[in-house]
């Protein structure tokens, strides 16, 4: 029993498998058929769209041709509006024509139906006569201009040359001369220009004389100002000492004055006078302190840059040494009163002399950029390496223990 049931189940299963296989094949065929139908539908739709586009273009061309034919003339439109005969016209059945051929035929009929034609622009006799008259007038004007330009040129050539003028006149009349040459000279304007030139000459001569007088006055006033700045010099019997720096400067520029030793004193009732000696450097341009205070600087020689006071130049001031070393002042040595040190202060100053000497020596070393002699080693023997490498404090502590 069990085997029969199993066999039946197997037969049913085989039949079912056959049915399923057949259905699958049918479904595949149906799908292929659907795809082919969809493709045909797409082709038909594409043809329909193209046909609609063609029909639209044909309609547009027909409408254009109708508009052209209607806009030709009112007479042709009135004739066309007449009622046509009732009899039907039998049109011959021929081959179908394209829209282009129809448009060409309609354009030909429209061109034949036109009664008025636009006149092309052409040159008439009146226009040519006006052109010839204008050309004659222009040629006559050009000839008259040429003649008028030749006349002033001849007058300029025949005009006598003026006498030579001074530089001040030439500078004064530069603008007027340029304007006279640029403009065209007429016979009425020539007399005016000659009068203006004479007036300008007289005015320039007056101006030149005035400027010369002003220059002489200014030079004399300047000389008077500069002459007032002189100082009392030494008597003529005094000997003049010439320094080498003064010689070198005088060879370069001869305007540098000779060094003069100045003296200042106050006469008493008996006629005796006191002379104060002032320290004078080698520079001959500034022999005393009062000179730079009272000197008048000329505007031509003064420059906008202030000289360097600390610069090493031959014309440095006497104030360079002030403030650099201890105890230096601007007063001369003759006015300084040296006090003699007392016996009590000698012992105090003796102890401080060594420290001052060391300070002065170090300062001179720094100023002269040389090392002091105290840096020199006392012996040339090299120290032992044992003392260098070992710690002295630890060694001493061990030795004490």
Curated annotation (Swiss-Prot):
Changing residue 28 to D: In mei-S332-3; induces missegregation of chromatids during meiosis. Residues 348-377 have a biased composition (Polar residues). GO terms for biological process: cell division; female meiotic nuclear division; male meiosis sister chromatid cohesion; male meiotic nuclear division; meiotic chromosome segregation; sister chromatid cohesion. Signal peptide: none annotated. Residues 82-197, 338-401 are annotated as: Disordered. Phosphorylation by polo-like kinase (PLK) on Thr-331 antagonizes cohesive function. Phosphorylation on Thr-331 at the metaphase anaphase transition leads to its dissociation from centromeres. In contrast, phosphorylation by aurB/ial on either Ser-124, Ser-125 or Ser-126 is required for association with centromeres. Keywords: Cell cycle, Cell division, Centromere, Chromosome, Chromosome partition, Coiled coil, Developmental protein, Meiosis, Mitosis, Phosphoprotein. Residues 171-183 have a biased composition (Acidic residues). Residues 387-401 have a biased composition (Basic residues). One of its GO terms (cellular component) is pericentric heterochromatin. Its main location: nucleus. The modification Phosphoserine is found at residues 124-126. Residues 3-49 form a coiled coil. The modification Phosphothreonine is found at residue 331. It is found in: Chromosome, Centromere. Residues 114-137 have a biased composition (Low complexity). It comes from the Eukaryota. Homodimer. Interacts with Incenp. Belongs to the shugoshin family. Plays a central role in chromosome cohesion during meiosis and mitosis by preventing premature dissociation of cohesin complex from centromeres after prophase, when most of cohesin complex dissociates from chromosomes arms. May act by protecting or Rad21 from cleavage by Sse/separase. Required during meiosis in both males and females. This is Shugoshin. It comes from Drosophila melanogaster.
């Amino acid at each position: 029993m069990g085997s029969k049931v199993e066999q039946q189940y197997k037969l049913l299963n085989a039949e079912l498998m056959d049915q399923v296989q057949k259905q699958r094949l049918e479904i595949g065929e149906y799908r292929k058929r659907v795809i082919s139908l969809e493709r045909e539908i797409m082709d038909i739709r594409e043809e329909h769209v193209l046909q609609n586009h063609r029909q639209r273009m044909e309609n547009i061309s027909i409408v254009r041709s109708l508009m052209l034919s209607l806009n030709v003339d009112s007479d042709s439109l009135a004739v066309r509006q007449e009622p046509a005969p009732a009899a039907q016209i039998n049109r011959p059945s021929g081959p179908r024509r394209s829209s282009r051929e129809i448009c060409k035929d309609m354009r030909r009929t429209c061109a034949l139906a036109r009664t008025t034609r636009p006149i092309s622009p052409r040159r008439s006799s009146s226009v040519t006569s006006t052109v010839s008259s204008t050309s004659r007038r222009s040629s006559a004007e050009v000839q008259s201009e040429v003649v008028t330009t030749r006349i002033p040129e001849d007058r300029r050539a025949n005009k006598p040359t003026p006498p030579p003028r001074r530089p001040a006149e030439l500078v004064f009349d530069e603008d007027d001369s340029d304007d006279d040459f640029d403009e065209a000279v007429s016979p009425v304007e020539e007399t005016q220009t000659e009068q203006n030139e004479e007036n300008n000459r007289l005015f320039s001569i007056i101006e030149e004389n005035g400027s010369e007088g002003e220059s002489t006055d200014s030079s004399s006033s300047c000389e008077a100002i500069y002459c007032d700045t002189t100082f009392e010099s030494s008597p003529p019997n005094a000997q003049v000492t010439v320094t080498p720096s003064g010689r070198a400067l005088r060879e370069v520029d001869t305007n540098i004055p000779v060094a003069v030793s100045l003296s200042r004193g106050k006469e008493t009732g008996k006629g005796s006078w006191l002379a104060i000696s002032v320290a004078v450097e080698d520079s001959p341009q500034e022999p005393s302190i009062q000179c730079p205070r009272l000197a008048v600087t000329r505007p031509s020689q003064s420059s906008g840059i202030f000289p360097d006071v600390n610069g090493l130049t031959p014309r440095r001031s006497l104030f360079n040494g002030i403030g650099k070393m201890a105890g230096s002042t601007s007063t001369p040595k003759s006015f300084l009163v040296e006090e003699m040190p007392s016996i009590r202060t000698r012992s105090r100053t003796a102890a401080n002399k060594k420290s001052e000497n060391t300070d002065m020596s170090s300062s001179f070393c720094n100023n002269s950029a040389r090392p002091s002699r105290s840096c020199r080693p006392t012996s040339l023997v090299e120290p032992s390496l044992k003392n260098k490498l070992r710690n002295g404090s630890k060694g001493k502590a061990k030795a004490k223990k």
